[in-house]
Amino acid sequence: MTKKQFPKITKQELERMDRALGLEVEARDPFNRYITFDNIRHFAYGIGDINPLYSDEEYANSTIWAGPVAPPSFLFSCFGRGAPQGLKGIHAMWTGASFEIHRPLTAGTKIFGTVALTGMEPKNTKFAALSILQEHTYTFRNLSNNVLANVKEWHMRTERDKARKRNKYENLRPATYTPSEIEKIYSEYDKEIIRGSNPRYWDDVIVGEKLAPVIKGPLRVTDNVAWKIGWGFRPFTYAHKLGVEYYKKHPMAYITNDSGIPDTSERVHWDPQFAQLVGVPSSYDFGPQRVAWLCQVLTNWMGDEGFITKFWSEVRRFNLVGDTHWLEGKVLKKEKHHDKHLVTIELWGKDQREEQTITGGATVELPLRK
């Protein structure tokens, strides 16, 4: 693929973005505006989550929720367009998110979202020198105007040319495996524990205890495609006329490929040559995808009656196609807050190189033994 010059971060564009800070607008055209059983199931299958609470409607109807209920990470599929992104042509590396969940995300709920640009922080990074950490804040409400959740997400905006020239990840190589190594990894999937209908009581939780790990990988482009099926078109994956119309409005969101066709910058997740143009050795996962994996550690552990009130995660390193991940957690604290019984949990994920690529934490409300 021919190397080209990409746009640069300018003072004028930063000043323009500063003027947009705090302006709250409608989150337009989300992939999911309604929480339905099918939408929940598609999202869960997109991360390989077989929890029956998300995929078996009859089972979900028998739980305390009296129907399917979505995990917090489902809200990634409810994000929409509208908030100022700015910095046209400057690559966006998704770096993390935080959730505050106020009400269960039950099937049958219609969601209304608003979004605002709430942060623009200059950073000096090893990856691409001057970068800009952007924060967007989403507020999701139901038909009664009750707040369901507040979600913040962060992007590191980096100049593609600088990132490629600095070549921070030149020693990072896509993984390969022998048949016996694949067999060993696949056997670990059988050890996954879904608590399900067996309640996890607050009384029984021990500070320091570890949560059963969740394994993902070795990552394939197929897994990224499955994620997109559940997550949706956002941010730039539009077909034919929709794609052409989006390109006409936002030409800098597309980069011409070797065939002379404008194509989405999102193809870093399935086109290894294009990924190399932005300074990464090969295609890699989506940040929200890995955060959803980490959230699965919680939902597997807490059982059907648990409720995640807070959850945050930061992506620290790339997860290349071919990498395998072990997502884990540990109980840090137990406490009573008014009539709620809460557990604070530390979360992390490591790849086959034993490098920690994602960190996070959560507060989970658990039932008390009667």
Task: Map each language-model feature to its residues.
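Short, charge-rich binding segments
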Residues: 67-68, 90, 102-109
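A short glycine-rich, hydrophobically flanked beta-strand micro-motif that places a catalytic Asp/Glu
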Residues: 308-313
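Hot-dog-fold acyl-thioester-processing enzymes
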Residues: 2-96, 159-305, 369
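HotDog/MaoC-like acyl-thioester-processing domains
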Residues: 1-20, 96, 103-202, 206-207, ...
